[in-house]
């Protein structure tokens, strides 16, 4: 088994629904994420996947969707209504 791993960080805000404490209010974190790609064999170049291409594609997607975004729970109707018109990312 062959494997490559990409690790990166991004900053986002969120809040916890149905929580009795200060985390019920909007706040932010620096998140650390890891992506693993596995293969039983290597390609014709001797790679699982082009590491640079994969890293760039994942980082671009994260930057466009999660970095410096406010991540909303789909049940958070109060905040969703308050932010209507803004670009929203909903989590389930």
Language-model region placement:
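Charge-rich, low-complexity N-terminal segments
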Residues: 1-92
């Amino acid at each position: 088994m062959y494997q490559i791993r990409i690790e990166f960080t991004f900053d986002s805000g969120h809040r916890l629904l149905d929580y009795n404490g200060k985390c019920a209010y909007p706040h932010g974190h620096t998140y650390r994420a890891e992506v693993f790609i596995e293969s039983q064999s290597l390609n014709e170049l001797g790679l699982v996947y082009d590491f640079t291409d994969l890293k760039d594609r994942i980082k671009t997607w994260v930057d466009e969707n999660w970095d410096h975004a406010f991540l909303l729970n789909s049940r958070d109707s109060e905040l969703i209504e308050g932010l209507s018109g803004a670009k929203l990312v909903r989590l389930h």
